[in-house]
Regions:
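Conserved acidic carboxylate
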Residues: 8
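Acidic catalytic/metal-coordinating carboxylates
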Residues: 35, 61-64
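Short amphipathic alpha-helix used as the core "switch/output" element in two-component signaling
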Residues: 63-74
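C-terminal output helix
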Residues: 106-115, 130-136
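Acidic, metal-coordinating helix/loop segments flanking the phosphotransfer/catalytic sites
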Residues: 32-50
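Active-site residues of response regulator receiver
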Residues: 54-55, 82
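C-terminal output/effector regions of signal-responsive regulators
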Residues: 135-175
Length: 175
């Protein structure tokens, strides 16, 4: 079971996020906090796997919270769920190591994708013993990039059936 906290100052949004998290039985929301300042003491004594974090919270914003988290030596994964969409803010948060970033409003399916990515990465790292090779690291990064699993697109006017027929023809007519 993954232990989750939510840092969100809007009670309605916090409640929705909690419901979204708990749809998946692997996750349990242990606490909801209105700001990062309230959450830090809790995090120092309670192991937490994942934080759902809003950027715009009172007392300290999401970036300040991530700095405080790092300074305390705490390393839970963080999914931003926020209305903050300014390029500088997004860049700053990415540089602080967030796991995913959802801009409000969003669909449940996007939230679920973020949780699935977290779970997949966490499980992969838990089952990897020793050092990771380049292939392993590529797999970790492809978890966060759906394009890595996508098939290359075919040229316009070419589909899988036609391509298979061409391959078969070439194989049968090798000289």
């Amino acid at each position: 079971m993954y232990h989750v906290i939510i840092i969100e100052d809007d009670p309605m949004v916090a409640s929705i996020n909690k419901q979204y998290v708990e749809v998946t039985p692997e996750f349990r929301v242990d606490r909801i906090f209105k700001n990062g300042s309230e959450a830090l003491p809790y995090l120092k004594t309670n192991p937490t796997d994942l934080i759902i974090l809003d950027y715009y919270t009172p007392v300290m914003n999401g970036g300040e919270f991530l700095d405080a988290l790092h300074n305390a030596g705490l390393t839970p994964s963080v999914i931003m769920v926020t209305s903050a969409n300014d390029t500088d803010i997004v860049r700053s948060l990415l540089n602080r190591g967030i796991t995913d970033y959802l801009v409000k409003p969003f669909e449940y399916t996007r939230f679920k994708t973020a949780l699935d990515r977290f779970t997949e990465t966490k499980k992969y790292l838990e089952h990897s013993h020793g050092g990771l090779g380049q292939h392993d690291i590529d797999r970790l990064f492809s978890v966060n990039d759906q394009r890595a699993d996508a098939k290359p697109s075919l040229a316009k006017g070419l589909n899988e059936t036609t391509l298979a027929m061409i391959r078969e023809y070439l194989q049968n007519n090798r000289n």
